[in-house]
């Protein structure tokens, strides 16, 4: 379908400490994609490092489609920044307490107060691409 919009989306690799996720130095490359491949709009792909979400089917080097938003619900897979680190985890909130939950029993849950300085939600996962 030639009327379908095709565009390129940035791929974010390792995020430099202290820099915004979409800072130019964090962008590995841009890849083309067709809008029809995803149900939701998104802003960038985040390249997965590590196996903390493997039981959710998210493996090392996968590209997770991230929509930039701080509006997330319990059970969403989110990109959270804690000081200079970015992590991909399940989100669970109760009052002011937030629990970031890995999908791998080898990793610990992260407990944090939503008012903690240096903590914020950068976005949520809306899809996944496995390159190869």
Would you name each region that the model predicts?
Residues 1-59, 86, 93-97, 122, ...:
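Short, positionally conserved secondary-structure boundary motifs
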């Amino acid at each position: 379908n030639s009327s379908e919009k095709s565009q390129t989306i940035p791929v974010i690799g390792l995020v430099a400490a202290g820099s915004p996720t979409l800072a130019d130095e964090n962008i590995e490359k841009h890849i083309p994609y067709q809008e029809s491949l995803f149900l939701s709009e998104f802003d960038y792909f985040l390249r997965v490092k590590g196996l903390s979400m493997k039981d959710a089917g998210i493996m090392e080097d996968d590209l997770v489609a991230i929509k930039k938003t701080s509006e997330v619900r319990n059970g969403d897979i989110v990109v959270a920044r804690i000081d200079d680190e970015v992590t991909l985890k399940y989100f669970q909130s109760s009052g002011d307490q937030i629990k970031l939950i890995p999908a791998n029993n080898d990793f610990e849950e992260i407990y944090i107060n939503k008012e903690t300085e240096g903590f914020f939600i950068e976005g949520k996962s809306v899809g996944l691409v496995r390159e190869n």
